[in-house]
Amino acid sequence: MKGDGRAGAHPEPTLKIDNQPLKREGSMTVSFAPVIQKVAPSVVKVFTSTEAKPNASRRGPGLEQFFGEKFRGFEFPDMQGSKPKSGLGSGVIVSPEGYILTNNHVIEGANTVKVVLSPGNEEYAAAVVGVDPKSDVAVLKIDALDLQPIELGNSDQILVGDLVLAIGNPFGVGQTVTMGMVSAKGRSNMGLDYEDFIQTDAAINPGNSGGALVDAEGRLIGVNTAILSQSGGNLGIGFAI
């Protein structure tokens, strides 16, 4: 594992932002492979280890936002509550300096955080350099070279009906891409103080939390955060911030 994961003074991130509107007219796209090839190296796996509390509550049904102990992004089975818990989620590299966006609930309470790059599966210790529980956003930092940061889009310009791609690490199976559309904008009543969610029918499952929601040109327009589900699996109602 590379890096020591300690927080400290860090350089300002260099962000690549594209505010141009999405091109909505033209010939139909038959493959998003070029977009995925561009974006995939920017999406990482996030692994956490947390000292477990005896008899901690387990995940229940309903709105699977994975907040805190009850709704962590995804927890590996733990038969004995006294053992450390391992959790996983996803993250998005947003600058060549190693800054990574994820959800606060993915890393909340974790004693250690590791990031695994794709491709190559290089593993790095990550420092938590910023959190905002009220909006469920966290910023990690790794010390790595030759990172490929994602291009940032403008979520204010998306429209209901725009195609979107969700990229993450559902259930720990590895990087996975799903496609859907923007189902609604401005969703709220999700239990956060600051809410303005993008709703999508792109498949989002436990482990996708913190992953990328990108437009048809591969620009980041949201961070996948929650699903509405009674079973804990995808039912076509996902939310990104």
Predicted regions and their residues:
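Serine-dependent protease modules
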Residues: K2-I241
